[in-house]
Amino acid sequence: MERFKVIIVEDVPLELKGTEGILHNEMPEADVIATADSEEEFWKQFRQNKPDLVLLDLGLGGSTTVGVEICRKLKNEH
C-alpha cells in the first residue's frame, strides 16, 4: 500500500500517544510527519509539511469551535 503523510492535532498527551500507537500498529503505511497541540502549531506544521491527512481533535483547547473552524478553513483553502 502507498505511504501517506499525517499530521495529528491533539492537545491531550495521552490521546496523542494513543492515536500515534493505533496508526503505527494498524496503518503502517501512515507516516506521522508532525503533531500539534494548538491551532497555531497546526498551521505552522501544515504549511511546512503538506500532509495527505489531518487527524483533528474537534474539541481542541477545550473549545468546540476551534477544530470546526480549522476544518472550514482547510476545506475552503485546500
Predicted region positions:
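Active-site residues of response regulator receiver
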Residues: 56-59
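Short acidic/histidine-rich motifs immediately flanking catalytic phosphotransfer sites
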Residues: 48-53
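Two-component/phosphorelay signaling modules centered on CheY-like receiver
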Residues: 12-39
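Short amphipathic alpha-helix used as the core "switch/output" element in two-component signaling
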Residues: 65-78
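The feature encodes the CheY-like receiver
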Residues: 61-63
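Short alpha-helical segment
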Residues: 40-42, 71
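Non-catalytic signal-transmission and effector/linker regions of two-component phosphorelay proteins
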Residues: 1-7
